[in-house]
Amino acid sequence: MQLSSVLLTAAGLLAPVYSSAIISIGRRSEGLDVSLASTGNTKVQVSVTNTGSSEISILRANTLFDASPTKKFTVYKEGSRKEVPFKGVHLRRSPSDLAKDNLQPIGPGQTIDKEFDLAETLNLSESGTYIVSADGVFPIIDPKSFSIASVIPYESNELKIEVDGKQVSGVLSTRAKIHDHLAQRADFNNGNCTDHQKAVIASALKRDSSIAGEASNAALSGDVRVFEQYFRTTDPSIRQQVSDRFHAISNEACSAEGGVVKYQCEDEMDVCRPGTVAYALLGSNVVVNCPIYYSVTAVSQACDAGDQALTVIHELSHIDAVYYPATTDLAYGEDASMALNADMSIRNADSYTFYANAVRQNCNPS
């Protein structure tokens, strides 16, 4: 770029040239109510009520309707400011693989109840009072086009439960043993990966390190409009935090064989169902690539697309050992992520994934 262009851009007189526009979907302010109730010790019932006047179809993936051991609740021990560490999985799914069996219809006035045992994904062996809540967004799907039409944000009541640790000591043990087993045997060269898979992973990590590095710089000194589009704020302290996370991800990605995260290519947790690209095992610093990962585009060219390197960013953002606190999955896909508020955005993995892509693709903030 010539000096004159630099000066004009800095002065705000010459707008940058963008590859395409970023377009956000609608955010519905009402229509679903979420309430939590205790059903005994570590078990919690979730009741989702459609308070609107028409039937809607909710995407199950990464929501309270997802049967996978994904993060659905925020849990604190009373008197502590530190969240109880999550021991389940964070999944990355392909938005192009939506199907009817991924939808949860709910009619007007209808309530759907789901029961979860918190001890299956949290270590609640210490007796006492715990505070449980849930927040996020429900992606609403157009059943004709199978695309996300809008999102409905939700925030549950705050529930206090009394836990007897002696009753739950064995609940997490089976899953924990699998985690420990994978953590001990999974590394870049010994995770049941073929030579082809190793080559794909190594290439994706190299690209990820560069993409995350660019995003780290952009978060601090790049176009503030693009940052605000994904993180809903221009607060300098938040920009610094986002930059620091990307910097940590970049460093981890360039340390494929010496980093804290290990790669596994065999799905011993049995969660690589259709549409699941990869998942992170929380507490074990293990990322598992599902078979579909190797058919995902290596390098995307669109502002709202994903690829192998962006999947790496998504999964590494979930690992506490890379950057604390780790992200979670509050929204699915770019459109739903851009409908989050500032507090949710900074905690949401896909907000980082698609911001990094927007920086790389030079996408235009709408």
Curated annotation (Swiss-Prot):
SMART domains: Aspzincin_M35. GO terms for molecular function: metal ion binding; metalloendopeptidase activity. This is Neutral protease 2 homolog BDBG_02110. The keyword Glycoprotein applies. Belongs to the peptidase M35 family. Zn(2+) binds at residues 314, 318. Its main location: secreted.
